[in-house]
């Protein structure tokens, strides 16, 4: 339930799909497990997991969705060894070289043979659709996984006019200014971790952890042409996170004190607690994203 990373996108046009219509659209692309010959499967699953019953969990016009991906694990080395063995056998028996086209066919046959016996792994990715601030927040540290989710959502809805979050001033420039000034705009507070990169392609990377970032040792790297590409921050008293220069948010962590706001919700009804946590998280993420976009400056106009 509690998001751990954020890849952020904003709508070019208002999102006006209600819960019922969204549920209906996603239902045509639900997840089903891999069959014996499937390499991978991808689809929407229950937003609240086994305790839920719907693909979309909504409250106050905030929509939580989830995709599940199952992938068969076929180690490349296993396939290579089987391929090499088969090719060597053919070349010895027929006294000729096996062509690339033949190798590709043999490789496909080996994969088909191994698939039914292969182990599989599953992963889930959640996203929060927030029409009130015209954004989608994907709980993933991987831009690829975020784009996969959005691609399936776009397919289900027919269109999805969103673009990655970006700003007129490069984020690394803004983070560098904060570090040089020794403070970030309220309600954000700098912590003790940063990563600096040289502005030149040949330059280096330096990482600081558990260190006062206003010390001369850190500032000297900025003076020699490095910029801050990662910076640990706190938002108010509720969220710790690592801001990245690509506009993604990593290592998002809600404080125990903040999460304790729902401790009075009855533990006898797991769904009631999940619903309360969703409402609490959603409200705070909206406040967080609004403050973050304001602090990082004007967003780039969409094309």
Swiss-Prot record:
Belongs to the RdgC family. InterPro entries: RdgC. It is found in: Cytoplasm, Nucleoid. May be involved in recombination. Keywords: Cytoplasm, DNA recombination. It holds the Pfam family RdgC. This is Recombination-associated protein RdgC. PANTHER family: RECOMBINATION-ASSOCIATED PROTEIN RDGC. GO terms for molecular function: double-stranded DNA binding. The gene is rdgC. One of its GO terms (cellular component) is cytoplasm. GO terms for biological process: DNA recombination; regulation of DNA recombination.
